[in-house]
C-alpha cells in the first residue's frame, strides 16, 4: 500500500495536557486541532506512520532513516513528564532507503544501541514524540502503529 494520508503537525509540549501546566487553556485550540488530525488520519487506517522530524539526528548533506527496532523518549515540562515507546517498521525503512538511492538521493540507515532486540532503540526527540502522542495511539485501536523516523539533511 502507498501513502494514505499526509499532514504537518505542531510539536510544542504544551499541547499534551499533562505537560501544559498553566498553559492548558491557552493551547486548547492547538490540542483540539491535533485531536481532529488524529481522527482524520485514523479514518485512513495507516499501518505505519512515517514522521520527518526537524529536531532529531542531524546529518550533514544526508537524509537519515531510522532502522532501529524501537524508538522511545521522555518529555518533561512544568515538573511533569510523558514517555512514549514505539516499534519501528524496519522493512519500510529499508524500502525508503532503497527508493531514495534509486532517485539519487543520499539516504543512510541509522541505528542506535544494538542491531536488533529491545536495545535497538533510537532516542525520540520532541518533534517526533509530540505528534505521535496524538497520532500514534488512536483511542479505538488496541495496538500502537509502527513508525519510521526520517531526519532531513542539513
Task: Please provide the spans of the model-predicted regions.
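A short aromatic-anchored loop/beta-hairpin motif
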Residues: 1-99, 103-108
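Internal, conserved structured core segments that host functional sites
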Residues: 94-154
Amino acid at each position: 500500500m502507498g501513502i494514505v494520508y499526509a499532514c504537518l503537525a505542531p510539536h510544542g509540549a504544551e499541547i499534551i495536557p499533562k505537560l501544559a501546566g498553566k498553559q492548558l487553556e491557552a493551547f486548547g485550540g492547538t490540542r483540539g486541532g491535533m485531536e481532529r488530525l488524529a481522527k482524520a488520519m485514523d479514518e485512513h487506517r495507516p499501518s505505519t506512520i512515517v514522521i520527518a522530524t526537524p529536531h532529531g539526528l542531524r546529518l550533514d548533506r544526508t537524509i537519515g532513516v531510522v532502522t532501529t527496532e524501537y524508538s522511545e523518549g521522555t518529555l518533561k515540562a512544568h515538573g511533569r513528564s510523558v514517555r512514549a515507546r514505539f516499534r519501528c517498521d524496519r522493512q519500510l525503512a529499508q524500502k525508503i532507503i532503497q527508493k531514495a538511492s534509486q532517485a539519487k538521493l543520499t539516504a543512510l540507515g541509522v541505528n542506535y544501541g544494538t542491531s536488533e532486540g529491545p536495545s535497538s532503540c533510537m532516542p525520540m526527540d520532541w518533534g517526533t514524540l509530540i505528534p505521535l502522542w496524538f497520532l500514534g495511539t488512536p483511542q479505538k485501536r488496541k495496538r500502537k502503529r509502527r513508525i519510521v523516523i526520517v531526519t532531513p539533511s542539513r
